[in-house]
Amino acid sequence: MDLRFLILAEGSFTPLRSKTANACIRYTPEHVVAVIDSTQAGRTAQDVLGFGGSIPVVGSLAAGLAGKPNALLIGIAPPGGQLPPSWRSLILEAMDRKLDIWSGLHTILSDDDEFARRARETGVRIHDLRQPPDDIDVARGRVREVDDRATVILTVGTDCNIGKMTTQLQLRDAMRARGARVAFAPTGQTGILVEGWGISVDAVIADFIAGAAERLVLHAAKDADIVLVEGQGSIIHPSYSGVTYGLIHGSLPHAMIMCAQPTRTAINNHPWVKIPPLRDFIVMQEAAAAPLRPAPVIAIALNTYDLDDAGARGAVERVTRETGLPTTDPVRFDPAPIIDAIEAFHRARFEHGGRTLAATRAEGGGARASKA
């Protein structure tokens, strides 16, 4: 079926608050007919986000139906992932209008008696993107089985919602344009929506998070030389660090890309948690990975959406100078500095007979950022 999404983001359609909507608009705009947000009605996605062209923002379901959608997409990923109670009636009305429902919330809509009953009555389907498979095993370090043929790159970050998924998707597209055999391993509901497969690891029972990550990498590595794993959370996040560590331990990355926002000095919604200087954070991040596999941070991806061009270029130059690592904003600018670092790292692994560059560095005193 050719999906035609009407995206529900009422009161939340912004560069940071509507993550699922924004990714769908950026990477699959051909499937989006309109966005519902009465506070932005009359504008376009381009006006609100800086991309998305003429996709309209409308004030109601009735107005959105003019675009002939066949599905309603829940366009937000709020803290806790719960369905806003005020949205229930609109979703039920959308089902009455024969729209399938796509949701990435922790609230599993197909388990809700009212939604399930209405779906049966109207003949529509509910797609819960965060519903994990029920046969995930614990991690057993099996990613080591692909060490002789694939390089695993994990995005990590100083906070949530800072660009870990977007960075990997930008890298995926640009690397494929270069002819690389690269795969993106989605670990969250929005990545699953864009890519069409994956596991939302934050919905997995804690004991099996690493196992889910392991499973994703093994699947992605079947037809790829480089696996780009979507990171989640942050090692210093007071709410979500458990998912972050599960991904590190399960995906066993060979190297990491650090994602940061130059203007963000504290964890969002937790202002008491200050973000350390980037060089210090890199040392902490590498130390977190080291017990299972030394994995250096080899490049920095900045999110400069809230800076003008001069400020963004200045931030890139400053971080490059301070860390000694290739740095760019892979959305705003050319992602080539990060891609070049990944390709050089991948080549070096196999030039060393399969030994990781991280191991070589560790023997010589640690990663470049740690020496700085």
List where the protein language model places each region.
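Walker A (P-loop) phosphate-binding motif
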Residues: 139-182
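Conserved catalytic-core segment of NTP-binding enzymes
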Residues: 107-109, 113-115, 128-129, 133-136, ...
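C-terminal lobe/tail of nucleotide-utilizing enzymes
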Residues: 5-8, 12-13, 45-62, 272-372
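Phosphate-bearing ligand-interacting subdomains
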Residues: 56-97, 101-111
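Extreme N-terminal, non-catalytic leader segments
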Residues: 90-152
